[in-house]
Amino acid sequence: MTIKGGAGDMKTAQADLTTGPLGKQIFRFSIPLIFSNLLQVLFNMADVAVVGRFAGSTALGAVGSTTIFVSLFTGFLIGLSGGVNVLVAHHFGADDQKNLSDTVHSAALTCAAAGLVLLGIGCGFAGGILRALNTKPELMDGAVLYLRIYCLGMPALAVYNFGNAVFSAVGDTRRPLYYLSIAGVINVVLNLFFVIVCNMDVAGVAVASIISQYFSAILVTAALLRSRESYCLRFSQLRFHKTRTKAILSIGIPSGLQNAIFALANLFIQRGVNTFSATMVAGNSAATNADALVYDVMQAFYTACGSFIGQNYGAGKKDRIRRTFLISTAYAFGAGLLLGLGLLLFGRPFLSLFTTDPQVMDAGMYRLTVMSVSYCVSAFMDGTIAASRGLGKSAVPMVIVILGSCVFRIIWVYTVFAWFGTITSLYLLYVFSWTITAAAEIIYFIRIYRQATADLAAA
C-alpha cells in the first residue's frame, strides 16, 4: 500500500488504496481483517466451548438456540456500519474533508441510536420470539436469559462497528485488530471465571460477552477521539447532519436489512432444526461455529472490496473498480474452498472443541458434510453485493437478497424439507439459494458498473 505523507495531506500515515498493485494490496489489507474476524469467531467459539464442556449439552443447546436471533441483530448493525464505511471511503478518496467529518459525527450518533433500539427490542421480545421458533421447553429458560443479557451489549457493538468501519475505510485495519484482541482475551478469561468459578452457566457467558463488547467500544472511541485526522471524533461536533445522515441510512439500512433478512430466513431453518431431537439441536449449534469461521474469513475480502472500490470510485479511477471486484471475489472463493475442505477432513476434531458427547458430534457432522463443499459458492453472491455497495448501491441488492435468499429459503422449508423431512434436505437450501442470488446480483452489478464508469468518464 502506498503511504502518503506531508503536513497538509489528509491521508498522512493512512493507506492509499487508489494506487499500486491491487492483488498484493487487497491481500495485505485483508490480513488484519482476517485475524480480526478470526479472533472474533474464536472468542465466540470459546463461549460455546466453555458452555458445552463445563455447563453441559442443555446449556449448549440453549445458547445455540439464540444464534440466529443474535445474528439478526448483529447483522443489522454490521450492515448499517457498512454504509458508514462506503461514505467515509468515498470522501477520503475524494479528499473531501468537510463531508468526511460530517459523515463520521452523524454516523456515531446513528449507530449508537440503532444499538439502543435493538437493546429495547431484544430485552422486551426475547421470550416471544424464541417461543415462536419452537425452542425446546428444556432450553427455553436458559435461551431467554442469555439473549436478554446479551442484548444489553448492543449499543457497545454498534459503536465498535462504527469505529471499525471508519478505520477500515481509510485503510487502517490494524487498530481494530488490536482492540478486538484485548477485548477478546478479557472475554475468554471472564467466561472461564463466571462459568467455572461462579457456576453462572449461560448467564456467565452472556455477561462476559457484554463486558468485552463495551471494552472494545471504549477503545475504538478513544482512538477516534485522540486522532488528529479529518476522520477524528469530537464530542462537541456530534450532530445529525441531514444530508450525511440520509446518505448513511440510504446505504446502511438496506445493507443492515439485507443481513437481518438472511438471519430472518435462517429463523425458519432453525425452526426446522428444532423439529428434531435436542441432540440434533446441540449438534447443529456446535457445527454452526464452522459457518462463522468460514464466513468471517471470507468477509475480510468483502470488506476490502467495498473499501477499495469506495476509495477508487471517489478518486475517479474506474479501471481499478472492476479489477478489485474480480480479485477480492477470487480470494474469497479460494478461502471458502480451502476452509470447507479442511472442515470436511477434520470435522470431528473441530466438533470435539465444543462437546464430548458422541451423539452430538454425529449430529454436527451432518451439517459439516453438506456445508463444507458449499461455502465457496457464497463468494459470488457476497462479493458482488460488497462491490455494489462500494458504488453506493444497496437497495436493489437488498431486494434481490429478499427474493433469492429469504423468500426462496422459506419456500424450500415448507416444500422440499417438508417433503423429505431429513436434516440433509434442510441444509441443502443454502447452496441453492446462494447460487440463485449470486446470478441475479452479478447481472445487477454489471449494469451499475457500466453506468458508474460512464459517469466517471463524463465527469
Question: Where do the language-model regions lie?
Answer:
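Short alpha-helical transmembrane segments in multi-pass integral membrane proteins
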Residues: 1-30, 88-155, 197-253, 309-374, ...
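Short runs within selected transmembrane alpha-helices of multi-pass transporters and secretion channels
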Residues: 81, 150-168, 176-184, 205-220, ...
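Transmembrane helical elements of multi-pass membrane transporters/channels
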Residues: 28-47, 149, 183, 212-216, ...
